[in-house]
Amino acid sequence: MSNKAVVFAYHDIGCAGIEALLNAGYEIAAVFTHADDPKENTFYGSVAQLCARKGIAVHAPEDANHPLWIERIAKLNPDYLFSFYYRNLLSEPLLATASKGAFNLHGSLLPRYRGRAPANWVLVKGETETGVTLHRMVKRADAGAIIAQERVAIERSDTALSLHHKLRDAAASLLRDTLPALAQGKITETAQDESKASYFGRRTAADGKIDWQRPAEELFNLVRAVTQPYPGAFCAVGEHKLIVWSAEVAKGNEGQAPGRVISVDPLRIACGQDSLVITSGQRNANGLFLGGPQLANELGLVDGSLLRGAESGRKPRRTRVLILGVNGFIGNHLSERLLRDDKYDVYGLDIGSDAIERLRSHPNFHFVEGDISIHSEWIEYHIKKCDVVLPLVAIATPIEYTRNPLRVFELDFEENLKLVRYCVKYNKRVIFPSTSEVYGMCQDKNFDEDTSNLIVGPINKQRWIYSVSKQLLDRVIWAYGAKGLNFTLFRPFNWMGPRLDRLDSARIGSSRAITQLILNLVEGTPIRLFDGGEQKRCFTDIADGIEALARIVDNENDCCNGQIINIGNPDNEASIRQLGEELLRQFEAHPLRGNFPPFAGFRDVESKAFYGAGYQDVEHRKPSIDNAKRLLNWEPTVEMSETIGNTLDFFLREAMLEIADRAKQEAR
């Protein structure tokens, strides 16, 4: 029986995995690892050195998912792929090269603590048990069926390093017991319970910052989660950095404010609850490792000193969010949602303000009326000033793609590229609105952010200029990401709701489909169905969409960094004809129905008669929302009929205001 394996491995758990495969009689055709980062403290075993000793071919490509590497791996005819602490996700085409399956060893008891740095996170969260899991690899990270698990107790004395050693030993034990059965096909697979899943992103040195307002128990867990060989928990003391390597919890805080030094021997600091005794640490990155009392002396601390940033009751600075296009459909709803949290200052610019009038009196909302193509100095200053930038300005109505293609390109690509470059210049996080249009005529059943092809029509079909402008900017942002830009791309799928457009926009043909259909009902003109109205879309309620976007802005645990996220409702798929029929049903039942003319019927129209010869439509557009579920813990909840009802009601009330205005003018 052939048991040929290709292995993706790093860390000394990667070494343990390779040793276990060899001991179980597997043939290792090749190993893929990472080159060590000279800026990283490599306290763990070297996979490359182990392979050199064992005479195993080893590679460290920048991208193992590149088609050339996939082709080379396929030629090895592996029965299995194994991933042991390899840091990159393996693509579906790569996973498919293994005839008997691909398997990953993860450092937690899945489905809990999916994602990065699970050994650190379980300590941060104060868990008393973790473990290792061998599971089948699928497209979604850490989501495949479980093959085997081994539990590991977490002692109060454990640090990230000691826990890592326990996990390494547990991994060796689990693989020793499981790999022979896997080779014989005698394994049982258990699907993961998604209701119990949790996901955590990567950790950085900045995550070790100590907030003395927190309970001492939380800070104790933080200290042991990031102590040596990691960068350590830290806070500022005057002009110095205090790095805490070990600590203990002491009951009570003597009624002192958080951050106040209760005593220097032992070095005891008051916390939001109880107090923390610092038993060892150092002053600054190049300082000596010292015990608590000597450390206090080095830092000039005395009883009653208050550590910087620890003033009692001091609230953290609100995150500054810059929304360009704040008066638009997404911009005004997102502003309202962020302001509800009271942890954001929202700065906005747009050429109008009708949709945000309800927000202008809010003390945390700051608006300037202006054009992004003119107010470049104001924009650059506010990008430099703010923490998060959302460039929402775009022409996003289909008729403009064929009527004004160059204007679409100038605004949607050229002007937005300037904004992205400012974000690069000032190292600011950008959340960029891509679009479901980038998928074009993709034939996948569900459009996937990471694997679906982006397919558009010929050059003479001008309608694709919007799609390719957005796609090109997506690619530019992705390339800047490789150079350090912090970004998230989100792709809305047919969001609908109040304030989507204006009826006046529909009168000149420059609106979304539902607004045009409502205008037909309001004015008693036939509802035009282009090319039969059989094109299907997945309609998403604005409340659902904004909730997902707000979670991207929150970016808990940095989970959205460098990600592309579809935001849509695959369960709300309907044709444009079905949309029109549901609109009509609700229109006829609406209390304001009597104020409008009789229904004039449906009329089939060729799309080119309205959009022009450069138009080309798409038959279906359904998102995969796996990334949104995994990263944001989000799913849409609003049914399409409710969304249609809310949208219809908004526009009918707008129409009633128009009727009242006309009556006033006629009475003069």
Curated annotation (Swiss-Prot):
Catalytic activity: UDP-alpha-D-glucuronate + NAD(+) = UDP-beta-L-threo-pentopyranos-4-ulose + CO2 + NADH; UDP-4-amino-4-deoxy-beta-L-arabinose + (6R)-10-formyltetrahydrofolate = UDP-4-deoxy-4-formamido-beta-L-arabinose + (6S)-5,6,7,8-tetrahydrofolate + H(+)
Amino acids binding NAD(+): 350, 371-372
Pathway it works in: Nucleotide-sugar biosynthesis; UDP-4-deoxy-4-formamido-beta-L-arabinose biosynthesis; UDP-4-deoxy-4-formamido-beta-L-arabinose from UDP-alpha-D-glucuronate: step 1/3; Nucleotide-sugar biosynthesis; UDP-4-deoxy-4-formamido-beta-L-arabinose biosynthesis; UDP-4-deoxy-4-formamido-beta-L-arabinose from UDP-alpha-D-glucuronate: step 3/3; Bacterial outer membrane biogenesis; lipopolysaccharide biosynthesis
Residues engaged in binding UDP-alpha-D-glucuronate: 396, 401, 435-436, 463, 494, 528-537, 615
Site description Transition state stabilizer, residues in chain: 104
The keyword NAD belongs to this UniProt entry's keyword annotation: yes
Positions of the catalytic residues: 106, 437, 621
Positions bearing the site annotation: Raises pKa of active site His: 142
GO terms of biological process kind: lipid A biosynthetic process; lipopolysaccharide biosynthetic process; response to antibiotic
Dehydrogenase ArnADH: annotated span: 317-668
Gene Ontology, cellular component aspect: membrane
InterPro entries for the chain: Arna-like_SDR_e, Bifun_polymyxin_resist_ArnA, Epimerase_deHydtase, Formyl_trans_C, Formyl_transf_N, Formyl_transf_N_sf, Formyl_transferase-like_C_sf, Lipid_A_modif_metabolic_enz
Pfam families listed in its UniProt record: Epimerase, Formyl_trans_C, Formyl_trans_N
Entries under SUPFAM superfamilies matching the protein: FMT C-terminal domain-like, Formyltransferase, NAD(P)-binding Rossmann-fold domains
Binding site for (6R)-10-formyltetrahydrofolate: 116, 138-142
GO MF annotation terms: carboxy-lyase activity; UDP-4-amino-4-deoxy-L-arabinose formyltransferase activity; UDP-glucuronate dehydrogenase activity
PANTHER family assigned: BIFUNCTIONAL POLYMYXIN RESISTANCE PROTEIN ARNA, UDP-D-APIOSE_UDP-D-XYLOSE SYNTHASE 2
Role this protein plays: Bifunctional enzyme that catalyzes the oxidative decarboxylation of UDP-glucuronic acid (UDP-GlcUA) to UDP-4-keto-arabinose (UDP-Ara4O) and the addition of a formyl group to UDP-4-amino-4-deoxy-L-arabinose (UDP-L-Ara4N) to form UDP-L-4-formamido-arabinose (UDP-L-Ara4FN). The modified arabinose is attached to lipid A and is required for resistance to polymyxin and cationic antimicrobial peptides.
Stated family: In the N-terminal section; belongs to the Fmt family. UDP-L-Ara4N formyltransferase subfamily.
Complex and partners: Homohexamer, formed by a dimer of trimers.
Protein name (database record): Bifunctional polymyxin resistance protein ArnA
